[in-house]
Amino acid sequence: GYTENEKISIAKGYLIPRQIRENGLRPDEVTFSDESLQTIIRSYTREAGVRGLERKIGAICRKAGTRIAEGEGKKFSITSELVEEFLEHPIYFGPEELNERTSLPGIVPGLAYTSFGGDILFIEATRMPGGRGFQVTGSIGNVMQESARAALSYVRSRAESLGLPEGFFEKNDIHLHIPSGATPKDGPSAGVTMATALVSLVSGRKVKPHLGMTGEITLRGQVLPIGGVKEKVLAANRNGLRTVILPKRNQFDLEDVPDEIKKSMKFIYVETVDDVLNAALEKPKLTNKKKTNAKKPVKSPKKGKSNDKGHVGGR
């Protein structure tokens, strides 16, 4: 996958000249600012490569060419505003969308690796009255099914030490869902995300903003290394995540990530699920304990008379 700066350089050096040429325009008739290219990359494409970026650039060139042919202008300097005018409503909404989707307990963004590069994978957990029922949906494969069951078993086995409500799993059914149901998903690297989503749901603690994670887990709560670290980190950066939780044994895989990306993000290396939960979830809210109004002992009045109601006894 390419970084955002690499995509801008490729667009200026190759994609824009080619689309201008293929659409019968002169180089001075349509120009793109870096800001406009950034808008296309962030709001209209979400990919590791540049194919979608070139298609959007081509669409803008065609619309600009049509306006030039109709006499509505001689030259177009493409800005972010013109991008939105030519391409209409943005497809993706960046960090704001992520924060909105994770504003409730039980929803956690994970990092996935696909044939198209890295991507964000949301894990959603909900509960229903019942008892011990568990289902996972979202077009997932056998390995991910097993990861989900391992995550549930770990959380149930640690319920007391995690401070989860007593008897919760005996009284509720659990449903895990991974959206984009038409896209097949598989692999073990969503284990930490599933475990975190379950604890978040049961405890009511939301995931911290701008945070993503990846890692396989064991029944004993160990976090194992995974693949596709570079692609996952690039996807996190593309989507506005500022913090990424990684297995400690993947630490050296960051050598493949460009320095500009590493400097702009925070990485937390974990060995256990407890490490993940401490880093990912908001601190539990302390319940306001009712203050006991202990009665102060009343001093026995001294001998003597006093007409002052504010004092007992003498001066």
Predicted regions and their residues:
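Conserved C-terminal "switch" segment of AAA+ ATPases
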Residues: 1-58, 63-76, 158-167, 205-208
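Residue-level marker of structural boundaries
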Residues: 16-17, 62, 92, 263, ...
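A glycine-rich phosphate-binding loop feature that marks nucleotide/adenosyl-phosphate handling sites
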Residues: 33-37, 60, 77-83, 170-179, ...
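Glycine/threonine-rich ATP-lid/beta-loop region of ATP-binding domains
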Residues: 47-111
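Peripheral, non-AAA+ core regions of ATP-driven protein-machinery
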Residues: 96, 104-109, 117-315
